[in-house]
A protein has these predicted regions:
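Long, charged, low-complexity intrinsically disordered regions
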Residues: 1-81
Length: 81
């Protein structure tokens, strides 16, 4: 059986055009302010460096995550535990 399709209730955080230095603060603000609406979507594009920074931030705050889906690996989903 395949993965369940995620339904996002909040608009995504789109990191296109954002520098790697800005990621930590933006991700923290977005996730902590919207954690009642999990799952959330953070659009990273294909940059592995951007994904790594997002994942590091999520791990620091104890959030579960999933990297994209079968058709699109350009985002990180922040999940309920």
């Amino acid at each position: 059986m395949g993965k369940t399709k995620l339904f996002f209730r909040k608009p995504p955080l789109d990191l296109h055009g954002i520098t790697h230095l800005e990621v930590q603060a933006l991700v923290e603000d977005y996730v902590l302010l919207n954690q009642a609406y999990l799952p959330l979507q953070i659009i990273t594009g294909n940059s592995q460096g951007m994904k790594n920074r997002v994942i590091k931030c999520l791990k620091e705050h104890g959030f579960a995550y999933q990297i994209g889906d079968a058709f699109n690996k350009g985002y990180v989903a922040v999940l309920k535990d």
